[in-house]
Amino acid sequence: MENFPIINLENLNGDERAKTMEMIKDACENWGFFELVNHGIPHEVMDTVEKLTKGHYKKCMEQRFKELVASKGLEAVQAEVTDLDWESTFFLRHLPTSNISQVPDLDEEYREVMRDFAKRLEKLAEELLDLLCENLGLEKGYLKNAFYGSKGPNFGTKVSNYPPCPKPDLIKGLRAHTDAGGIILLFQDDKVSGLQLLKDEQWIDVPPMRHSIVVNLGDQLEVITNGKYKSVMHRVIAQTDGTRMSLASFYNPGNDAVIYPAPSLIEESKQVYPKFVFDDYMKLYAGLKFQPKEPRFEAMKAMEANVELVDQIASA
C-alpha cells in the first residue's frame, strides 16, 4: 500500500518546490486528502486550541453526551446503528459573519483563541487554493474567486469530540460521506485515531500526527476541476478507549456562488459536471449526505437542464 501523502510546506521555498508541488498534485488527483506539516500555524497556538477544546468538552459537553446516550439506549444496542453518529459537536461560523460571540458556554479566552485560529486557517486555505490553481494551470485567485459569491466565502469550524464507544462495530463515530463544500482543514487528535478514507475500495487510516493539518477536497473542487481532483468518501471509527478531538474547518463557496467546471479544464468539449448555485447543492446534500455523491451531481444536471429549457422557452 502506498504511503499516505504528507506534505512539508516549508519545502515550497527551496530546491524541493517542484517535487512538493508534484506531491500536492498527486494527492489531489489520487487521494483527495493530504497531511501538512510546517504549515505556518505556530505549535503553541495549536496546543492552546487543543487544551481549551478538550477542557470545554469536559466542562460543558461530556455530561450532556452521556445523558443523550442513556436516553437513546445506545450502550445496549445489538444491531448496527445507521441513523446517528457517536459524536459530540458544535459549530462556529467565521465568514461571512461570525457567530462566536453568540455560541453559549464558551469562555472568553476560548472565543478569542478560536477567532485567531480561524484567521490563520482562512489564510492557509487561500494559500492552498492558489497552490491548486498553479498545479491546474489556472490564474492565481481563480478558485478563491469561484467561491466568492456576493458576500464572500462561507467559512466555519465543526468542533467534535468522539468519546469512548462500547460498541464501535455497531456505531460509527461519523458515517461514511464526502464533504459538500470546497477545501477542508482538519486539526485532529494526535493520540486517538479514527479517521479513515476510501481508496481503491479499501479503508485507509489517516495517521494522527502532532501539529499537522489534514486537508481534504470537497465536492465543489471536484466540479470546478471537472473531475481532475477528487472528493473522496471518509468516515470516523469510534474507539473503545480515549476521546478523539477533531476541529474541521470548511472553506466553502458563498451561498449564491455559481459553481461550474473551469473552462480551461474541459478537454475536447466534454463537461462532465453540471453548473449550479452552491446553496441549491447544499439543500440537496442535507438529505443525502451519507449517500454517494454521483446521484447528487446527476440531480444538479437535471436541474440545470430544466433551467436551460425555461430560458429557451422564455427567449423563444
Swiss-Prot record:
GO terms for molecular function: 1-aminocyclopropane-1-carboxylate oxidase activity; 2-oxoglutarate-dependent dioxygenase activity; L-ascorbic acid binding; metal ion binding. Belongs to the iron/ascorbate-dependent oxidoreductase family. Its EC number is 1.14.17.4. The keyword Nucleotidyltransferase does not apply. Keywords: Ethylene biosynthesis, Fruit ripening, Iron, Metal-binding, Oxidoreductase, Vitamin C. GO terms for biological process: coumarin biosynthetic process; ethylene biosynthetic process; fruit ripening; response to molecule of fungal origin. Fe cation binds at residues 177, 179, 234. The gene is ACO4. Its cofactor is Fe cation. PANTHER family: OXOGLUTARATE/IRON-DEPENDENT DIOXYGENASE (PTHR47991). Pathway: Alkene biosynthesis; ethylene biosynthesis via S-adenosyl-L-methionine; ethylene from S-adenosyl-L-methionine: step 2/2. It catalyses: 1-aminocyclopropane-1-carboxylate + L-ascorbate + O2 = ethene + L-dehydroascorbate + hydrogen cyanide + CO2 + 2 H2O. It is an enzyme of class 1 (oxidoreductase). Residues 153-253 form the Fe2OG dioxygenase domain. It comes from the Eukaryota. This is 1-aminocyclopropane-1-carboxylate oxidase 4.
